[in-house]
Amino acid sequence: MVIYHAIKGVDEAGNPDQTSGELVRLIGENCHTVVADNEIAERYSRHLKKLLSIPSLLYKTTDFLSEVIYNSSKFVVEECPAPELPPGVRVPREDEYIVRAALISHPIIVTAEDRVLKAVSRESVLALIALTPAEALELAKDT
C-alpha cells in the first residue's frame, strides 16, 4: 500500500525510500486527488489506525490524515458500488477490489504491487492505467 510506504518512508521491500512520501506530499500540495470506494476507504482506515499506534509514526500519520484524508478536496470516496469485472478479465483475486473500484471513475491506479501493474496493463479492455509510485511521482511533478 503506497500510503503505508509513504508514512513509513520505505519501498515495497521495506528499504528506506521516500518516493511514496514525496508523491503523497505533492498530492497534498497540488490539484491531485486520492479517489477510493468504500472498501478501499475502510482499508485505509484500518491501516492508518495501526500506524497511529506506532509512536515513531504518529506525527507522519497525523500529518497525512489532516493533509489528505480529512481534506475533502484531496480525498474523495465514491459512493456507488464497484462494478463487476468484465467477462474474461483476470486479475489476482486478492487485488480484484482495487481494479473494480477503479472502474467507477477510471483514476490512475498507483501501486507498488507488481501483480496489479501487470494485470492492469495486460487487460486493455479495462481501459485503466496503473503506475508505480516512481512513475506517479514523475507525473505529479509535471502537473
Give the positions of each predicted feature:
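A short acidic (Asp/Glu
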Residues: 6-8, 44-48, 120-122
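PIN-domain endoribonuclease scaffold, especially VapC-family toxins
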Residues: 25-31, 38-84
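Active-site neighborhoods of divalent-metal-dependent phosphate/nucleic-acid chemistry enzymes
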Residues: 70-108, 119-121
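Alpha-helix capping/helix-boundary segments
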Residues: 2, 40, 97-98, 115-117
